[in-house]
Structure formats: structure tokens, C-alpha cells
Curated annotation (Swiss-Prot):
One of its GO terms (cellular component) is cytoplasm. HAMAP family: MurA. This is UDP-N-acetylglucosamine 1-carboxyvinyltransferase 2. It comes from Shouchella clausii (strain KSM-K16). NCBIfam families: murA, PRK09369.1, PRK12830.1. Coiled coil: none annotated. The active site is at 116 (proton donor).
Length: 428
């Protein structure tokens, strides 16, 4: 196991190129199960979640060739192999295997997923959708069992706007009989990306990206080639890093309209943001003005950038309030920021950040993916050396993080954990 070391205080300057979207990739790969011939996915991020999904598709009989940012999936020999345990539990997004396998085989057994532990992230809306389509769903010994004689289109109203449920119902409905209407659907760009892949395969989907999605079921889906959209969360993370420590940072391979909420908040703080067709240029400015953040479903401020933005706010003037309306337990980074000298406290669903903290390097631990990003940003801003453990979380969602940061002028490197540190990890 490794840790990431960051020598703080170095100015960032230069160009960073954004990878394909993690939150698309983890849905697009299971979607390939639905096809009857080969699916090729380009612009894949090189992250551990993608490797895990490739292994899971192989487990159910798929022939998967994973090259440099490209995956070719041959689904012809896939079977409805039960996956109650093992790798499936390491991955939050393994729940997309439910919708895809239900759509293709009319049955699935999937172990309840893991990934980031952000408090209760129930899949009740997914289950509601599957049942509306005609599936029987039971939870037996920590695995979800899905069975259906046939799937029939239905009108499904989501009680909570959920990206996962919207995509999962789409996956199950594209080969169902008749029309499915998803109301109060999520509108995230990743949903449009999945719908684009499915449409290329022959699915009939209208309204992806709006709050009402209509799907007319088809009997067969053929393979296709699809390129993933850029990762707006990775892009937002580098925007925040550039605002914190950047002189002039070019962020390439982005879709600026996907990041309007982040751009607006950075400008409110005094950061200069220049927008072009597929590029953003960020110039950090001092003094930074404190701002309040409230996470909302897209196109609001993304919950995935709440933790990284909190690190930036420790250097701003005045008091800032960060409220997460999506996940109420997404504040595990706060204790670690406090270790570094930040003045932050949690009250309910909000963290209150008293700015102008002078951060000091410390030993900190990433408890989840975006907490990891927050600690890296804090390390870039801090005086001295910060050691971040829990790198397995960061590697789930950020491709070649230290390589990209080094190119921008940061001093970042990996080291193996000492035996003493390994013992501490085991005990925790």
C-alpha cells in the first residue's frame, strides 16, 4: 500500500488534460451487457473502478479487451451468473449490473455495493422502478435478487431525483415491451451520455437531460462504438486547485457548460475564469472572498465537489457555509482538515469554514474519493509536507493524479507505507 506526499506552497502553471467521465464509464460498461455484439468504449479513464468492472464482465462470461483508454466488450457469451459476493461489493456503481442484467436476462443477483461510504445512499428508487417494470425484487443475505417473467413498460415517478435510479431504470427498460416513462428524472450530463450509447445500440430514448424520459422498448440491441464525455468532476477539481494555487492553468478537454455552477462560485470568490469551446483558463487571485455553497442536483453545484471546495474556502476571507443537500454524511474530510490547522466545524448538513487559516502539512487519511481530493488540495496549499493515506479511494476516480499535478509544477510523489503505518491501517 502507498501514500501520497505533497510538498505545499508551489505555484501551479501549465496545461492539464481531463480524462473521460468516471460517472459515465461505470454505467456505460454494464450497459454493454444489453448488446448482442461487440461494444467499443473510447476515452475511458484509467482508474481502478474501470478495471473492477472489466473483471466483473469477465466473471459473467464476457470477453473484455482493455487497452489504452479503450475497452472492447464482446457480450455474446455472457450469462446471468449470480454475483452475490466478491469484487461486486467493492464498487458502488456495481448496482448498474442490476438494470443491465435484468434487461438482458430477466434475472440478476448482485451483492449490495460498496465504494465510498457516504452515509445512507438507499437504492429504494431503483427497486421501485424495477418492480414497476414487472420484476420481483428481494434482499437476501446482503444481495439483491431480481426476477421477471417479462418486463413491461410503465410510468415511473421518482420520489427523489436520483442519477443512479434514472440510469438503472433506463438500462432495464430499453428491452422491455412497450413504453416506459421516467418522471422527475435526473438531468446530469452522464445520463445523456448513457442514453447516447444506448441509442447508438438501437434503443429508442427521448428526453434524456430533461426531467421526463420516454423509452420505447426494442427486441434487440447491436454493438456500437462510443466515446465518453469529459469528466466534469475531475475538471472541477483542477479548477479548484488552480484557484487555490494557480498562476494561469489551462484545463483542456472540458465542456464548460457542464461546470457553470463551479465557474460562478469561483468568479464570486475573485478567481479569473476564461471559457472557450473545450478549454478553461483559471488564474487564482488573492485575496479570495468567502462564499456560501449549497449542493443541488444538476445543473446545481455538484455534491462531488463540495469537499474539494471546502479546502479552498479555508484560504478565503470571512466565514463560508457549505451545505450538502444530497448526502448528509459527506463531511469526513473536516476532521482531517482540522488536523492541518483549518477552522471548520460541522452543524447538521453544513460545514462552517472560518477563512484565512494557515494550513500546515500533516498525516491525513482519505475516507472516500472526494475527501481524498480535498486533502490533496489542502496539501498543495499547506506549509510543509502532507502525507495522504487511503490512496485506493483516490485511484478510484482520478487518472494519473500525481503525473498531472507534477506537470503543473506541484511537488507530489508516492511512497510505500512503513510497516508501522500498515499496522495502523489494519487496526483502523
Amino acid at each position: 500500500m502507498q501514500k501520497l506526499l505533497i510538498e505545499g506552497g508551489h505555484t501551479l502553471e501549465g496545461t492539464v488534460s481531463i480524462s473521460g467521465a468516471k460517472n459515465s464509464a461505470v454505467a456505460l460498461i454494464p450497459a454493454a451487457i444489453l448488446a448482442d455484439s461487440a461494444v467499443v468504449i473510447d476515452n475511458l479513464p484509467v482508474i481502478s473502478d474501470v478495471d473492477l468492472l472489466a473483471e466483473l464482465l469477465r466473471e459473467i462470461g464476457g470477453d473484455v479487451d482493455l487497452g489504452n483508454q479503450t475497452m472492447t466488450i464482446h457480450p455474446e457469451k455472457m450469462v446471468a451468473m449470480p454475483l452475490p459476493n466478491g469484487r461486486v461489493k467493492k464498487l458502488r456503481a456495481s448496482y448498474y449490473l442490476m438494470g443491465a442484467m435484468l434487461g438482458k436476462f430477466k434475472k440478476a443477483v448482485i451483492g449490495l455495493p460498496g465504494g465510498c461510504n457516504l452515509g445512507p445512499r438507499p437504492i429504494d428508487q431503483h427497486i421501485k422502478g424495477f418492480e414497476a417494470l414487472g420484476a420481483q425484487v428481494t434482499n437476501e443475505q446482503g444481495a439483491i435478487y431480481l426476477r421477471a417473467n417479462e418486463l413491461r413498460g410503465a410510468k415511473i415517478y421518482l420520489d427523489v431525483v436520483s442519477v443512479g435510479a434514472t440510469i438503472n431504470i433506463m438500462l432495464a427498460a430499453v428491452r422491455a415491451k412497450g413504453r416506459t416513462i421516467i418522471e422527475n428524472a435526473a438531468k446530469e450530463p452522464e445520463i445523456i451520455d448513457v442514453a447516447t450509447l444506448l441509442t447508438s445500440m438501437g434503443a429508442k430514448i427521448k428526453g434524456a437531460g430533461t426531467n421526463v424520459i420516454r423509452i420505447d422498448g426494442v427486441d434487440h440491441l447491436q454493438g456500437c462504438r462510443h466515446s465518453i464525455i469529459p469528466d466534469r468532476i475531475e475538471a472541477g477539481t483542477y479548477m479548484i486547485m488552480a484557484a487555490a494555487m494557480g498562476r494561469r492553468v489551462h484545463i483542456d478537454n472540458v465542456i464548460p457548460t457542464h461546470l457553470e455552477s463551479v465557474t460562478a462560485k469561483l468568479r464570486e470568490m475573485g478567481t479569473t475564469v476564461e471559457e472557450y469551446d473545450d478549454q478553461l483558463i483559471i488564474s487564482g487571485m488573492d485575496p479570495k472572498k468567502g462564499v456560501d455553497i449549497k449542493t443541488l442536483v444538476y445543473p446545481g453545484f455538484p455534491t462531488d465537489l463540495q469537499q474539494p471546495f471546502t479546502s479552498l474556502l479555508t484560504s478565503a476571507e470571512g466565514t463560508s457555509i457549505v451545505t450538502d443537500t444530497i448526502y448528509d454524511a459527506r463531511f469526513k474530510h473536516v476532521d482531517e482538515l482540522r488536523r492541518m490547522g483549518a477552522s471548520v466545524k460541522v452543524e447538521g448538513r453544513s460545514s462552517i469554514v472560518n477563512g484565512k487559516s494557515s494550513l500546515q502539512g500533516a498525516k491525513v487519511k482519505a475516507s472516500d474519493l472526494r475527501a481524498g481530493a480535498a486533502l490533496v488540495i489542502a496539501g498543495l496549499m499547506a506549509e510543509g509536507i502532507t502525507e495522504v493515506s487511503g490512496l485506493e479511494h483516490i485511484d478510484r476516480g482520478y487518472e494519473h493524479l500525481e503525473t498531472k499535478l507534477t506537470r503543473l509544477g506541484a511537488k507530489v510523489w508516492r511512497e510505500e507505507l512503513t510497516e508501522e503505518e500498515l499496522e495502523q491501517v489494519k487496526q483502523s
